[in-house]
Design a protein with these regions (language model features):
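Membrane topogenic helices and adjacent juxtamembrane segments
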Residues: 1-45, 138-139
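C-terminal alpha-helical interaction appendages
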Residues: 12, 40-142
Length: 142
């Protein structure tokens, strides 16, 4: 699973760099509001609930935390929004945790796909049928 996590980190950071370059900071409040919309927020909470009790090794946790901090700082330096930075870094943690736990949660795969499509997830997400691992491996080959 280390390879898949490496690929996730690489694609997530690369996509986020492009997202932040293209982001109109005047839209941050709208993005935050859309993420607080019931269906998005509830789906996020449900996905978190599925991995909340999962146990990861110290190395896995440290690896996720390191990238999460990098994502937070990168986002904050471009947006000056601690709320958006927290949301995006927590999204990375959620996606990485589901990947390491090898779960099959189509909403989390859709969350990841939205980032890889260089968009900040909000509102309703386009459904992705592959597992998260399958999705990342397809991206790694492209």
């Amino acid at each position: 699973m280390a390879y898949e996590l490496e690929q996730l980190q690489r694609f997530f950071i690369s996509s986020l760099e492009q997202i932040l370059t293209d982001l109109d900071v005047a839209l941050i409040d709208e993005i935050l509001d859309d993420r607080d919309f019931t269906s998005f927020s509830q789906s996020w909470e449900d996905a978190f609930g599925h991995i909340e009790e999962k146990k990861f090794t110290v190395d896995e946790k440290n690896n996720i935390d390191k990238t999460r901090q990098e994502v937070f700082m990168m986002t904050f330096s471009k947006t000056n929004s601690s709320d958006l930075s927290a949301y995006i870094s927590e999204d990375f943690e959620l996606i990485a945790s589901h990947l390491l736990a090898n779960t099959n949660n189509t909403w989390v795969t859709s969350l990841c796909a939205t980032y890889f499509q260089k968009k900040i997830p909000q509102g309703e997400l386009r459904s992705i049928k592959e597992t998260l691992k399958e999705f990342i491996l397809v991206w790694a080959k492209s």
